[in-house]
Amino acid sequence: MKQKTTTFKSGFVSIIGRPNVGKSTLLNRVIGQKIAIMSDKPQTTRNKVQGVLTRDDAQLVFMDTPGIHKPKHRLGDFMMKVAKNTLREVDLILYVVEADAKFGPGEQYIIERLQETKTPVFLLINKIDKVSPEELLKVIDLYKDRYPFAEIIPISALEGNNVPTLVEQIVEHMEEGPQYYPADQVTDHPERFIIAELIREKVLHLTKEEIPHSVAVVIEQIKKRDNGKVYVGATVIVERSSQKGIIIGKHGAMLKEVGQLARSDIEALLGSSVYLELWVKVQKDWRNRPSQLKDYGFNENEY
């Protein structure tokens, strides 16, 4: 009879990559719950969301960092600081690239950042369904020549292909360590943060190109009512009056749809019925104002 191992492994893992390569999709696939905002627009991940995967033999704490890019405003500066700080404090880096994307200056910039750290790096080639096996081999060779990756693993974060293999490889790479979080905890962010992110995800998804990333969501109140329902009051912050009009929509239709979709996710998160009330407020140029960035939850000292 095979003796069960008593060794428990743990460690911190950072997920990095250019904007919109599937980092949040991967994190949510690994954890099994929606905790990192997903959108088809770049720069949707702003704060360093932590996802925690606990098994009988290991605990992995994942960091989902903003896409690495050249900052264009103070919010961009904040996002880049978060990404760079994360690389210094983890045991393993997962660098996600798209199988069908060309290697350009953005990829070169990230590899140069990786060369500044001694942390082991796994290269994850995502969206493998979009290329042929021959094309995939060319992508592997291309990256092999540029950096000594500890592992190169082709995956499909959306479909889940090869993700279990990836998790096993990560655990194998970790050293013996303590359990940092309770077994039933999947993130260290408070519920208010996750609820705000779920609402923001719906705004970005429904408004498509009309609303850029000048959107923040502030949770004003969360309160359990006598009837058992949870009341959530939230304000969507935009930079221009025209954006406010788009989010509210004709006769309030857009805001209503945002609310319905967000409420469904919030109910799944909280495990109870939710009454969601939304307001929209204009705060001009908030992304360049440090005091407002702090008010809306972007505090670089915490990261």
Curated annotation (Swiss-Prot):
Localization recorded for this chain is:
Cytoplasm; Cell membrane
Q: Which GO cellular component terms, listed alphabetically, does the Swiss-Prot or TrEMBL entry include?
A: cytosol; plasma membrane
Q: Which portions of the sequence form the region G2?
A: 43-47
Positions of region (G1): 17-24
Residues that, per the record, bind GTP:
17-24, 64-68, 126-129
**In which broad location class does this protein mainly occur, judging by the first location in its UniProt entry?**
cytoplasm
Source organism superkingdom: Bacteria
According to the UniProt record, where is the region G4? Answer: 126-129
Q: Which Pfam families match?
A: KH_2, MMR_HSR1
Record domain Era-type G: where: 9-176
Cite the InterPro entries for this sequence.
Answer: G_ERA_dom, GTP-bd, GTPase_Era-like, KH_dom-like_a/b, KH_dom_type_2, KH_sf_prok-type, P-loop_NTPase, Small_GTP-bd
Residue ranges of domain KH type-2 in the record: 199-284
Q: Where is this region: G3?
A: 64-67
**Alphabetically ordered keywords of this record:** Cell membrane, Cytoplasm, GTP-binding, Membrane, Nucleotide-binding, Ribosome biogenesis, RNA-binding, rRNA-binding
State the membrane topology.
Peripheral membrane protein
Which SUPFAM superfamilies does this entry report, sorted A to Z? Answer: P-loop containing nucleoside triphosphate hydrolases, Prokaryotic type KH domain (KH-domain type II)
- Region (G5) residue spans: 155-157
Instruction: Provide the GO MF annotations for this entry.
Output: GTP binding; GTPase activity; ribosomal small subunit binding; small ribosomal subunit rRNA binding
What the protein does comes down to: An essential GTPase that binds both GDP and GTP, with rapid nucleotide exchange. Plays a role in 16S rRNA processing and 30S ribosomal subunit biogenesis and possibly also in cell cycle regulation and energy metabolism.
Per the record, the similarity remark reads: Belongs to the TRAFAC class TrmE-Era-EngA-EngB-Septin-like GTPase superfamily. Era GTPase family.
| UniProt cross-references to HAMAP family, sorted A to Z | GTPase_Era
Q: Whom does it interact with, and what assembly results? A: Monomer.
- What is the name of the protein in this document? GTPase Era
**Organism in which the protein naturally occurs:** Shouchella clausii (strain KSM-K16) (Alkalihalobacillus clausii)
